[in-house]
């Protein structure tokens, strides 16, 4: 038998195995996909922040093919006076070697990979308008056989004008990447090339503009027994940050520029207490046109009463929903005194220009 015939036979056999495996994993992918939707809806039900709305992720249609399936879903947000529908369309590529991954020379076996795009309706049309893109939001997802996976959410570059506040926003290359393990977000990376906002004088009491370039935020977080408190690390880097303000009443102007800033926030849970450690480094700090040099600080809050911190976070959420904050804060201060918040400043390094600037601005009160 000629070698060419043997090779052809091997190719045909492998193709047959691939087709059979793809069909089998397509069925498994459908089962896993619908299971994940059920888990997601249960999570929505338990999320306290959504108490005023009911959110459901509903599968409308699942058309299973040999190598890929086509899916129609919708997110339903039920509020007191309205229901918002967000349509989604997905292509789910079957394992063990999903075609979209093979096209990128990625041969790592997976149950499935998928690409989800935002559909058009009266609610979502605004996303297409402000981004001028047919793919304003795109979600790429892959799940392996250990039921861990990766999700990548992309927001197309765009511009937005808020008619009520007369504020302008624009952004470019916004990407959120999340590693998933046992249905729990573990690691994430948010990157933004540019973000700008501009709020004029006549819209607010103080005009404000913000410019951000090369923002990267990396985090590894785990939930704790407190709903709003997570343990882990958050690292952020900003290549350039600028904020300019101008008071509508006095006309006083203020300018702040930070270059190459890095920050690390660590939250540790020990029994009923929480430790918060923050480290920050700035290569350059400019205030009102004055270059004040480098800034480095290391601050720790050790052995914070976890219940006190959780109640404070609850109050901040309540304040956002209420007209007055006094009663909430008085109640909290009565229950938790300053001993619940031990502050330890480990180190603070200021450049000589910044030190002189702060000394010049300081107001001394003698007793």
From Swiss-Prot:
Instruction: Determine the domain of life of the protein's source.
Output: Bacteria
The membrane topology noted for this protein in its Swiss-Prot or TrEMBL record is:
Single-pass membrane protein
Keyword field: Membrane, Transmembrane, Transmembrane helix
Does the keyword section mention Glycoprotein? no
Locate the transmembrane regions by residue number: 6-26
Q: Where in the cell is it found?
A: Membrane
Which Pfam families does the record associate with it?
DUF945 (PF06097)
Q: Is ATP-binding included in the keywords of this UniProt record?
A: no
GO cellular component term of the entry, any? membrane
InterPro entries membership:
DUF945 (IPR010352)
Spell out the family assignment given in the record's similarity comment.
To E.coli YdgA and YihF.
Tell me what this protein is called.
Uncharacterized protein HI_1236
